[in-house]
């Protein structure tokens, strides 16, 4: 269990058990290293990532307090829509053909038709189930972001920023687009990825955001570069206010790469701080 592993590794004073609807989840809180914090950054990890993931999540949550921002890194639920078995057809038993050899040929055609009809129904069931589970996933994730915002407010955070990494950036963008919560002032996407079959796509979501947004991506990957270009073009078409992009190059040394990312995030959060 990833949460149990984190509980053993992370200092107890950083661990917070937050309540979201009917479930509790682990969040990691680090207060800003100043008497006058600028606010709190809520960090949303991507699929398969923990609240202290070594890429982006952990380094940012550890470094942001030195930039006068508290950090609150949350864990996301296991998504139902990721665990769908597509072979629903097998759940429906096909009619048995007669065992007598002479009549097999006459019964083959209606059996094939029946099996074909069942496959179409099964495909529709899979599509409907996927949509239902995707909505359920979104509600569970939104409840966790709600709980994180409430906790940051309890800690008297003057300003609240949401930062999403990987698919966490997609879910955070969905949350901010659908909820349009007044408590969140800024949004940062890092290496944004959309989950498989995600609707709406990320390029349709980002132009709907009504708050300053930084889209940080890695230019080394052609697919990511193309997706970032789509997001920029969509934002220009809708004249999205305060949408900016930052292109980074991947560095061979992970520590240097994480420091580069932190400097870009810090520079956007604290414009007066020299890079």
What are the functions of these language-model segments?
Residues 83-155:
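Alpha/beta-hydrolase active-site loop
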């Amino acid at each position: 269990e990833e949460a149990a592993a984190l509980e053993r590794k992370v200092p107890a004073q950083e661990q917070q058990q937050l309540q979201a609807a009917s479930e509790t989840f682990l969040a990691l809180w680090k207060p800003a290293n100043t008497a006058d914090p600028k606010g709190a950054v809520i960090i949303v990890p991507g699929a398969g990532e923990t609240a202290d993931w070594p890429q982006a999540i952990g380094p940012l949550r550890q470094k942001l307090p030195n930039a006068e921002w508290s950090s609150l890194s949350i864990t996301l639920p296991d998504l139902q829509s990721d665990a769908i078995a597509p072979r629903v057809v097998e759940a429906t038993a096909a009619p048995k053909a007669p065992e007598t050899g002479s009549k097999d040929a006459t019964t083959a055609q209606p059996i094939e038709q029946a099996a074909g009809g069942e496959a179409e129904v099964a495909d529709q069931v899979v599509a409907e189930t996927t949509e239902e589970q995707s909505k359920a996933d979104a509600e569970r994730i939104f409840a966790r972001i709600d709980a994180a915002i409430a906790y940051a407010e309890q800690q008297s955070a003057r300003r609240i920023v949401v930062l999403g990494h990987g698919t966490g950036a997609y879910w955070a963008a969905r949350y901010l687009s659908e909820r349009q919560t007044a408590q969140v002032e800024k949004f940062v996407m890092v290496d944004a990825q959309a989950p498989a079959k995600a609707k709406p796509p990320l390029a349709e979501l980002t132009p709907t955001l009504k708050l300053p947004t930084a889209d940080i991506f890695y230019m080394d990957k052609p697919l990511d570069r193309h997706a970032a270009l789509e997001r920029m073009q969509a934002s220009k078409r809708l004249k999205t206010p305060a949408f900016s992009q930052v292109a980074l190059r991947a560095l061979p040394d992970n520590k240097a790469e994480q420091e580069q990312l932190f400097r870009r995030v810090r520079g956007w959060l604290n414009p007066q701080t020299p890079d």
